């Protein structure tokens, strides 16, 4: 992805996940916004892009952070919201036996005490494979991958969800279900 497209993708993540009001947007409860409204509000803040570029970024992103509606008129972040405007209703799913969480080693002491909590997001994000978890953890420093006993959690009454981009979500992960 070109630097311009990467910059726009980061801008879209910021707006669609965290601060839509920063450019005067409101998201609906499911996180959707009309693409033409997004383009106009972004232009007023100096971010210039068009419908074709948005579709290109969404379609060519390996992380699949965004979803475009079936009619092609709206966009939303697939998951990762901290804004309270959004409450996507994911359908609960039975997880695989293990899921993975990538983090930085400097957070491990806190995790041992508190488990994994969503903090300023709505869910804890989990990966289906270790490689993805390593990439996620590397963004925050020296990575460590935690193996989550997801199926055991599910059998004990915890819920798991899966976003459209394949990221697994849970409200929290108590430490007794985490393997270092």
Swiss-Prot record:
A UniProt-annotated Pfam family: PTS_2-RNA
Entry superkingdom: Bacteria
Keyword match Glycoprotein: no
Any one GO MF annotation of this record: NAD+ poly-ADP-ribosyltransferase activity
EC identifiers of the protein: 2.7.1.-
GO biological process: tRNA splicing, via endonucleolytic cleavage and ligation
Record-linked InterPro entries: Ptrans_KptA/Tpt1 (IPR002745), RNA_2'-PTrans_C (IPR042081), RNA_2'-PTrans_KptA (IPR022928), RNA_2'-PTrans_N (IPR042080)
Alphabetically ordered keywords of this record: NAD, Transferase
Entry similarity comment: Belongs to the KptA/TPT1 family.
Task performed by this protein: Removes the 2'-phosphate from RNA via an intermediate in which the phosphate is ADP-ribosylated by NAD followed by a presumed transesterification to release the RNA and generate ADP-ribose 1''-2''-cyclic phosphate (APPR>P). May function as an ADP-ribosylase.
Full protein name: Probable RNA 2'-phosphotransferase
Organism of origin: Pectobacterium atrosepticum (strain SCRI 1043 / ATCC BAA-672) (Erwinia carotovora subsp. atroseptica)
């Amino acid at each position: 992805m070109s630097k311009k497209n990467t910059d726009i993708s980061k801008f879209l993540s910021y707006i669609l996940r965290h601060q839509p009001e920063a450019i005067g947007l409101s998201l609906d409860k499911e996180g959707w916004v009309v693409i033409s409204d997004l383009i106009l509000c972004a232009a007023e803040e100096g971010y210039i892009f068009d419908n074709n570029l948005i579709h290109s970024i969404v379609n060519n992103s390996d992380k699949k952070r965004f979803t475009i509606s079936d009619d092609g008129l709206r966009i939303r972040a697939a998951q990762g919201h901290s804004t309270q405007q959004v409450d996507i209703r994911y359908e609960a799913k039975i997880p695989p036996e293990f899921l993975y969480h990538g983090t930085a080693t400097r957070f491990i002491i806190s995790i041992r005490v508190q488990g994994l909590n969503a903090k300023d997001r709505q869910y804890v994000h989990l990966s289906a494979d270790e490689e993805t978890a390593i990439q996620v953890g590397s963004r925050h420093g020296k990575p460590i991958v935690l193996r989550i006993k997801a199926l055991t959690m599910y059998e004990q009454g915890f819920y798991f969800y899966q976003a459209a981009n394949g990221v697994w979500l849970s409200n929290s992960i108590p430490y007794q279900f985490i393997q270092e």
